[in-house]
Swiss-Prot record:
Belongs to the class-II aminoacyl-tRNA synthetase family. ProS type 1 subfamily. This is Proline--tRNA ligase. HAMAP family: Pro_tRNA_synth_type1. One of its GO terms (molecular function) is ATP binding.
Amino acid sequence: MRTSQYLLATQKETPADAVVISHQLMLRAGMIRKLASGLYTWLPMGLRVMRKVEAVVREEMNAAGALEVLMPSIQPAELWQESGRWEQYGPELLRLKDRHQRDFCVGPTHEEVITDLARNELSSYKQLPLNLYQIQTKFRDEIRPRFGLMRGREFIMKDAYSFHADQASLQETYDRMHQAYSNVFTRLGLDFRPVQADTGSIGGSYSHEFHVLAESGEDDVIFSDSSDYAANIEKAEAIPRETVRPAPTEELRLVDTPNAKTIAQLVENHGLPIEKTVKTLIVRGAEEGKLIALIVRGDHELNEIKATKLEQVADPLVMATEAELRDAIGAGAGSLGPLNLPLEIIIDRSVALMSDFGIGANIDDKHYFGVNWERDLPVPQVADLRNVVEGDPSPDGQGTLVIKRGIEVGHIFQLGTKYSEALKCQVLGENGKPVVLSMGCYGIGVSRVVAAAIEQSYDDKGIIWNDALAPFQIALVPLRYETDVVREATDKLYAELTAAGYEVLLDDRDKKTSPGIKFADMELIGIPHRIVVSDRGLAEGNLEYKHRTEQDAQALPLNEVLTFLQARVRR
């Protein structure tokens, strides 16, 4: 491809509304253009990258035994009402009416549509398992679209759905898709982690997220430094570093603390180490009118997902109001503790191993110091209540936990029978009786992968693509292309490279465009291999080669170009 025949839409300045680096660089490199809030047009340069992602995804889905379909993006309300999600989904679901005043939505996901297809097409266990996928435009009406393609309203997604007669079959396909996802992100050259995850609003019983590691990521990714253990922050099990509770060394004492409404103030004003403090959080219980006390160490954070999985706690988690605290305990939020507390108490594992610690006295402006379990109060129910912190022991017993930021690019679920039961999707089983199908759901954010790859690999000059993702593999930049000797050598080399199967962008802009601008544009776009053709180099029988990640260029004999590139360019 020649730049004279291409839409080369690079920009020197960074748009003011672009915050994250992927958004900035995709605009500046001429990959996308904003149409409206959360809506983007893909220009040729960006579309080439996304098509490469799609190609790898298709190959791995096909290899895993999935069959490609294409479902409508507009979905009838009746299906969503049948599943119960028409009202549950909330304002992110873009609802509309046709000219006959019938209700539809723009699909944010396709569980209902695929389940409707399956219940109409499948009748026997002999047709199972069945795994169907599509690459389709989705729409979620985000309240505040931001970060370009990282959190837009319209996006491209690969979603697959599998149907099974039993759990064993679902597990087999789930494992195969897990491997297929790992294959996809490995082939795309990304540094990623598959992590155990909570199933969230999609539902189901078991799931994994796939995260590209990047400092700009919105999620915490937890993994062991010595094993394959990995989980997201909601799912990661918190194991105490301590194994034994120390013996008491202090006497219990009641202390006036008028200036200690928070843990930070308690530490600062009374010299108590933060790891010797606790937070007593009062939440509403699952039983109407009941309050539950959840206690974590002062330097730890309550994990709301873990808390709501306790049978005593209401879901979603709701903190007690100040009025409720006064009515039930007689003290405000800054002075609460487990001693003489007239509520059911659940403490975190780390709290159960504390000694000589400080707690609120359930009297305004007073705390107990030197508190010890079993001596001063009984050990209540113990549970995993907190977020893990870096350095915690790995739950599998191997190594310690590391925390990195990650961008979620894939998510796989074992849905079970949630949708098949709601939509009555069943077949005749081997015994001739109806069997409600078990389902799996598997998503990859195709357009998000492009942005995530940039967040992981860039410098002050622009994007750094690897060979698998680059819009072009080679940038061919002639100096003084208007001269016969340079033009003839460049055109000959361009023909040889394209005939050999390389994707080449020939920068044939005229002499009004300086070499510096050409080099800067190719680096901004992120093309991994650059070859410069100059009359001086040709006189010596050489070209100039430079990799995008290298500082210095090197002389490359003209007659060794193809051999050299064969060893350097991943194809």
